[in-house]
């Protein structure tokens, strides 16, 4: 709803602009604008030269390290398919229209100036496809000289102003309001804010050149209208208005902007020209500006009345329509209010508590802003619910204009002791401006969910990031859009459960919890940790997954490895929405914390008990005898990266040390492990099969293909875990969990599949890409045993010859051992003399290179699902293989 800064509605096209063409054409705008007169210092600091240099430096610092925008596949089939966008932006309203904000850590990474590709976007419809050469802006209404200006006239015939300004959507932080009660707006997070350097023509200069009438002749309002065709009100442009006094006020720095951060505007941000009204909400800054109309009355546009209002809390949408609240002038939003947000610690950040971290201060950071040009004078942080406040250091590189106005956010930071954080229940922030405005402690709901500026609170809890140490995990109130997470979301979940179950006891108040008639303690859940009774905990709910063991596509181990534990992070990291819906069928009750005790190293005790003391003493590590095997299905084990070798431009060999140099890994042949890492503040878990022998002591090796971002158009961001691994310095520690999988090769042709024995004398082994690694382990195990006579026929498919992993080892084994045959298939040959197949796995290739179907032949496969579904299974069936019983998929 809230019309926000960088975005105005952009539905249809206007004034002869044609419908969008096929994807991929160049954006119809000049890469550089024609030479224009230097900007005036009309209302800037008198130090014009210093200011210009400072702006260039700010732009340079703020726009580095930004990946290229792409034609996002999510825009395919929409009228915006021709626009390149940054793939990291969080989409808030599905595919279309495009409304988005950057991830909060990405926004803050760039500091004071926001790169244009990361600037938040508010669009009501499709983006107009504009051309600089034929775009005009009409000034009409109560003026003596109505004029239609071309872009060249705006550029060359008028002085320009250039200055930094922060744009904020009136809906910034709306999702917090939606957690209390659903508003009529979508879920903006805390990053509906961005700062750019804007350049354009002063509005007052343009109006005076057209001879704006005096107040006595009725010129009381200045209306703005965009180019889009929108559905609101039965069909309209996007339009709004401001008072004449505001429009002509030289201290306001209102401009018709045609440049952002030194470049022409981008399509999402209003190309070729838009309004910039510093200190106002984004909803007044019309993009793709076509008309300026001087009128006696305020704008009659549908969006001027039905958007950007703060109505009293008792007014819902029905009452607002019935009693015409939308048309009451007292509730319109113009200037921004005071606001502040904590950005560091970020959501789900974990701060380990150890001898090193407790000796160092921790920096809490964030941003603050106010409206109307009012300076932010003070930011305070509390760790004790407002009993005491610590004053923050402000970083405000902006200089005021010569009227003393400030148009930009400020960044703030404060040092706190780690041990003080350990004893805190939450961190909260509030800001003050020069008018002594500050933020309310509690949220005040309104039907549009706008101008939310209550204290921003980050919750803290004690966790155990690694065996033997504790840490603090931080939780923001919400995550933007439809993303899950945030302490407010969990509290809302609990509240809904309480409403559906009036018998819920108030003492059961964990924010993770949703209660039914049955509750269980942690100690009860721990007892259900085997194939006879496998319970898990996800977000405080208890699930009995016993009857799903045999049906889990990842095998029984995938459940048993977490049975009897809280596996919320692991479940969220690797399961789809469909899987999450399926899980509800197995829900049997809720976890209660009223009888919680921390008698196990796997528990995550909280310091937020009912007393005022901090019960840290129960957090103890139980010393257990040294194990000869490192892997433990119930625990993650920390493993240190000790070497990294580049095999090719995108293939790496990683060696990780086990927790002790006298340990075996303990991974059965055919099973795999999970690598666990926090990437971009989210838990990432990926399955890998080590390539080192299961008999190696003290370490394991992984051969990993790195999927870099920007290489494959279908996966513009690349592989999350593989890129993370590639970036790790030597000495980094990752968590490993396992063993996982339902297939075990026990030797001499014998397998255990879902715990049931299988036997084969011949194996058809079909691999694709990185799916060679489990096949490789089985091959190694067979060849290592001179009495294992199992025949192996490997068909290994890849895109190119360069993509083939472990080729040297496979070829060497094939030459040395008669019982191993290897055949390669690549999609395209890049050199002459390629002696293997080109194309895809086909019936003819399998006929020639794998054994005939028989009772003592098994097919093993691992690779991309499309390969297995469309190449392996149908072609094996053509050869007479029983794929239901004799095809084993890793």
UniProtKB/Swiss-Prot annotation:
Domain of life, per lineage: Eukaryota
Keywords: Disulfide bond, FAD, Flavoprotein, Heme, Iron, Metal-binding, Molybdenum, NAD, Nitrate assimilation, Oxidoreductase
Amino acids binding FAD: 686-689, 703-708, 715, 720-722, 773
Sample GO molecular function, one term: nitrate reductase (NADPH) activity
Free-text remark on how the cofactor is bound: Binds 1 FAD.
CDD domains: cyt_b5_reduct_like (cd06183), eukary_NR_Moco (cd02112)
Catalytic activity from the UniProt record: nitrite + NAD(+) + H2O = nitrate + NADH + H(+)
InterPro entries xrefs: Cbr1-like_FAD-bd_dom (IPR008333), Cyt_B5-like_heme/steroid-bd (IPR001199), Cyt_B5-like_heme/steroid_sf (IPR036400), Cyt_B5_heme-BS (IPR018506), FAD-bd_FR_type (IPR017927), Flavoprot_Pyr_Nucl_cyt_Rdtase (IPR001709), FNR_nucleotide-bd (IPR039261), Ig_E-set (IPR014756)
UniProt-annotated binding residues for Mo-molybdopterin: 169
Cofactor(s) of this protein: FAD; heme; Mo-molybdopterin
Domain Cytochrome b5 heme-binding: 517-592
Domain FAD-binding FR-type per the UniProt entry, residue ranges: 634-746
EC number: 1.7.1.1
GO terms under biological process: nitrate assimilation; nitric oxide biosynthetic process
Positions with a binding annotation for heme: 552, 575
Region annotated Disordered, chain positions: 1-51
Record's function text: Nitrate reductase is a key enzyme involved in the first step of nitrate assimilation in plants, fungi and bacteria.
Family: Belongs to the nitrate reductase family.
UniProt subunit comment: Homodimer.
Name this polypeptide is given: Inducible nitrate reductase [NADH] 2
Organism: Glycine max (Soybean)
């Amino acid at each position: 709803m809230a019309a926000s800064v960088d975005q105005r509605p952009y539905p249809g096209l206007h004034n002869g602009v044609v419908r969008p063409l096929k994807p991929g054409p160049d954006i119809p705008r000049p890469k550089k604008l024609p030479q224009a007169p230097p900007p005036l210092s009309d209302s800037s600091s008198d130090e014009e030269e210093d200011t210009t240099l400072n702006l260039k430096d700010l732009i340079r610092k703020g726009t580095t390290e930004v990946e290229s925008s792409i034609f996002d596949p999510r825009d395919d089939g929409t009228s915006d398919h021709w626009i390149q966008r940054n793939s990291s932006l969080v989409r808030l309203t599905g595919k279309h229209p495009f409304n988005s904000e950057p991830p909060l850590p990405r926004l803050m990474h760039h500091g004071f100036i926001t790169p244009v590709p990361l600037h938040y976007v508010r669009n009501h419809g499709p983006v107009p496809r504009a051309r600089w050469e034929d775009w005009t802006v009409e000034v009409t209404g109560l003026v003596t000289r109505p004029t239609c200006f071309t872009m060249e006239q705006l550029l060359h015939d008028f002085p320009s102003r250039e200055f930094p300004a922060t744009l904020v959507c009136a809906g910034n932080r709306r999702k917090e309001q939606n957690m209390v009660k659903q508003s009529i707006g979508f879920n903006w997070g805390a990053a509906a804010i961005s700062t750019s350097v804007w350049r354009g023509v002063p509005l007052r200069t343009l109006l005076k050149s057209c001879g704006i009438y005096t107040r006595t002749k009725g010129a009381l309002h200045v209306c703005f209208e965009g180019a889009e065709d929108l559905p609101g009100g039965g069909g309209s442009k996007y339009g709004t208005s401001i008072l004449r006094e505001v429009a002509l006020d030289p201290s306001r720095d209102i401009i018709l902007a045609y440049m952002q951060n030194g470049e022409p505007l981008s399509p999402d941000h209003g190309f070729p020209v838009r309004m910039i009204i510093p200190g106002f909400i984004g909803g007044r800054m019309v993009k793709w500006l076509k008309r300026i109309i001087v009128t006696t009355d305020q704008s009659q546009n549908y969006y001027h009345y039905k958007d950007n209002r703060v109505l009293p809390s008792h007014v819902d949408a029905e009452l607002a329509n019935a009693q015409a609240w939308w048309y009451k002038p007292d509730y319109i939003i113009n200037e921004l209010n005071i606001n502040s947000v904590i950005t560091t610690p970020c959501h789900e950040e974990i701060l380990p508590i150890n001898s090193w971290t407790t000796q160092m201060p921790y920096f809490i950071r964030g941003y603050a802003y106010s409206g109307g040009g009012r300076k932010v004078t003070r930011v305070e942080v509390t760790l004790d619910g407002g009993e005491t406040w610590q004053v923050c250091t402000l970083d405000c590189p902006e200089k005021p204009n010569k009227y003393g106005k400030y148009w930009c956010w400020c960044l703030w930071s404060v040092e706190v002791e780690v041990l003080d954080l350990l004893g805190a229940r939450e961190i909260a922030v509030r800001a003050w401006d020069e008018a002594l405005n500050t933020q309310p402690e509690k949220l005040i709901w309104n039907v549009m969910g706008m101008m939310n500026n209550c204290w921003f609170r980050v919750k803290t809890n004690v966790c155990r990031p690694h065996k033997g140490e504790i840490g603090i995990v931080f939780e923001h109130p919400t995550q933007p859009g439809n993303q899950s997470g945030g302490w407010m979301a969990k509290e809302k979940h609990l509240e809904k459960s309480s409403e559906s179950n009036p018998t819920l006891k108030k003492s059961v108040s964990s924010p993770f919890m949703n209660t039914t008639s049955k509750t269980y303690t942690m100690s009860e859940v721990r007892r259900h940790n085997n194939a006879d009774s496998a319970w898990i905990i996800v977000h405080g709910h208890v699930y009995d997954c016993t009857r799903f063991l045999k049906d889990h596509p990842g095998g029984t181990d995938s459940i048993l490895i977490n049975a009897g534990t809280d596996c919320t992070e692991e479940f969220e990291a690797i399961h789809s929405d469909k899987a999450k819906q399926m899980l509800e069928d197995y829900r049997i009750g809720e976890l209660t914390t009223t009888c919680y005790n921390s008698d196990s190293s796997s528990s995550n005790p909280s310091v937020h008990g009912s007393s005022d003391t901090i019960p840290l003493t129960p957090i103890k590590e139980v010393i257990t005898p040294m194990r000869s095997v490192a892997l433990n299905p119930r625990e993650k084990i920390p493993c240190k990266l000790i070497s990294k070798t580049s095999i090719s431009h995108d293939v790496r060999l990683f060696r990780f040390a086990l927790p002790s140099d006298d340990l075996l890994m303990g991974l059965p042949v055919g099973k795999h492990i999970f690598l666990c890492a926090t990437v971009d503040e989210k838990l990432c878990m990926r399955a890998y099969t080590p390539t080192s022998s299961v008999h190696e002591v003290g370490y394991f090796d992984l051969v990993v293909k790195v999927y870099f971002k920007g290489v494959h158009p279908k996966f513009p961001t690349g592989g999350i875990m593989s890129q993370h691994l590639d970036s790790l310095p030597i000495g980094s520690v990752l968590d490993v969990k396992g063993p996982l999988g339902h297939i075990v090769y026990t030797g001499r042709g014998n397998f255990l599949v879902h715990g049931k024995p299988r036997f084969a004398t011949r194996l058809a082994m079909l691999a694709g890409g990185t799916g060679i690694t489990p096949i490789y382990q089985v091959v190694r195990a067979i060849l290592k045993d001179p009495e294992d006579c199992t025949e192996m026929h490997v068909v290994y498919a890849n895109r190119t010859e360069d993509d083939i992993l472990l080729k040297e080892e496979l070829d060497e084994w094939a030459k040395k051992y008669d019982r191993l045959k290897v055949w390669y298939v690549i999609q395209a040959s890049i050199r002459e003399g390629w002696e293997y197949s080109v194309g895809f796995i086909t019936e003819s290739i399998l006929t020639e290179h794998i054994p005939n179907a028989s009772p003592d032949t098994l097919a093993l496969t691992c690779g991309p699902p499309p390969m297995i579904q469309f190449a392996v299974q149908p072609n094996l069936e053509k050869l007479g293989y029983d794929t239901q019983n004799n095809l084993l998929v890793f």
